[in-house]
Amino acid sequence: MSESDSNHLTGRDWLWLGLICSFGLGSVATQMAWVLALLGGYLFWRKGAAVIDPSLRQMWFWLGCLAIPAFCSIFDSTLMDRSVRTLLRMMSFGLVAVVLIQMPPSVTALKKITIGVALAIGFFCLDGIFQKVIGHNIIGNALWSDQFNPTRITGFLGLNYAWVLMVLSPWLFEGCRLVDKRGFAYWVAIPLLFVAVILGGSRASGLLLVISVLSYATLIGVRLGVRASVQFVVPVFASLLGSVVVLSANPELGDRWLAMMGVFPGGAGDAAEILSWRPYLWDAAIALFLEHPINGVGIRAFGVSSESLLANYGVADRIPGAAYNWSPHLSVLEVAADLGAIGLLGYAMLLTTLVRWLINAPMLAIAPGLTALMALFPLGSTLPLFSARVSAVAWISIAAALAFAKVATHSQRQ
C-alpha cells in the first residue's frame, strides 16, 4: 500500500468512527451492538482460537465482574424475566468485543478517528446551543418542556443531551490534544463544552464534567508531564470562571444550578421540590440492600421492589414514570440494591482494574477508556447503570479501548 493510501480511512475505519459517534444517538448504538453481537457469535464459532487473545480475555474478565453477580441475583429477583434479559444483553457485549478486538481500525486511523469524534462532539455542542438560542436545533427539533425544565435542550442527542456530552468529553479533550500540541484547541472546545452543559441545566452532568476534567488532567500529567496537564487545566479554569459569570448574570440558569443543593438536608428550600424524591430513592436502595445483602433484589428489579417502601414514604406519586422503570439515581446504590455485596465487590474490582489498566495503556486508548469510566462512574445519577444505553456506551467503549491499545502496542513493537 502506498503512503498516500495509508493516510486515508478505510471502510472499516469509517465504520469505527460511525460506531463511536452513535454513542450519542442512544437506540442506534444499542441496535448496532446487537448486530455486532450476532457477527461476534459467528466469528467465535468459526475462529474459536480468538479466545486466546489477551485483549479479549481482559474484556471477559471485566464483564464477569458484573455478569457473575447479575447471574447470582436472578435467583431472588422480583422481576426474573427482566433480570434474565438484562444479563443476556450484558453478556452479548462479550461477543461484540470479539468483532471489535479482532477487527480493529488501522494504526494510521487511530488519531483521525479520535479527532473525528471530537469534531462530532463539538458539533453536538453547537447544535444544542443553537437550539437554546433560537428555539430549535439545526434539523428543526424544538426545545423539550417537562416538569423539570420548561426549555430543555435535546439537539441530536435527545433528553440526556448533557449526560452524553460529559460521557464523551474525553474524546473532545484528546482530539484537541492531538490536533494542536500547543493547546490552542482547548481554548475553543472547552468553553464550548461548558456553555453547552450550563444551558443543558443538568446538575448531575456538571459533576461528571468535573470528574472527566480531573481524570483526564491527572492521566496526561502522569503520562506526558506537568506541562501537558497545565495546557489543559488553564482553559478549564478560565471556562469555569466564565461559567460563574454567566450563572450570576442569568437568574433562571443560576437558580436551576443552585437547586442541586436541595438533595441535601437544609438545602435550597422550595427550589428542592424537583429533587425532593431522590433521597427517598437512596433510602429505599439502602433498605433493600440491608434486606438482601448477599445477591440483591435482582438486576433491574429495584423499581418494583421499592414501590411499597416509597409508597410508605409518601413520595411514590411524585416520582416520574412507572415503578417498573425507577432506579436509585446513584450508580453505586443501584449496584448495591440490585446485586448485593457480591455486586459491590465485582463493581469495585471492575473500576480499580480498569483504572490501573488505563494508567499503563497507550495514549490512544485513553479516550475510550475514560468514556467507559464516565459511564460507569459510581455517583452517576442521570440514567440507570444497567440500562441499555449506559451498557452500550460503557462496554463498547471498553472494547474500543482494548482494540485501540492492541493496535497501538503492535505498531510500537514493529
PLM region descriptions:
Residues 126, 130, 199, 220-269, ...:
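A membrane-periplasm/extracellular boundary helix in multi-pass inner-membrane enzymes
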Residues 36-42, 209, 213-214, 241, ...:
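Transmembrane alpha-helices of multi-pass inner-membrane enzymes
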Residues 13-18, 141-156, 276, 318-333:
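Juxtamembrane membrane-water interface segments that cap and precede transmembrane helices
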Residues 27-46, 87-97, 160-169, 207-214, ...:
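Membrane-embedded alpha-helical segments of multi-pass membrane proteins
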Residues 11-19, 189, 326-330, 348-350, ...:
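Loop-to-helix entry and N-terminal half of a specific, functionally important transmembrane alpha helix
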Residues 1-85, 95-115, 119, 176-184, ...:
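Transmembrane signal-anchor hairpin modules in multi-pass inner-membrane enzymes, especially those
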Residues 268-283, 291, 295-339:
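Long extracytoplasmic/lumenal interhelical loops at the membrane interface
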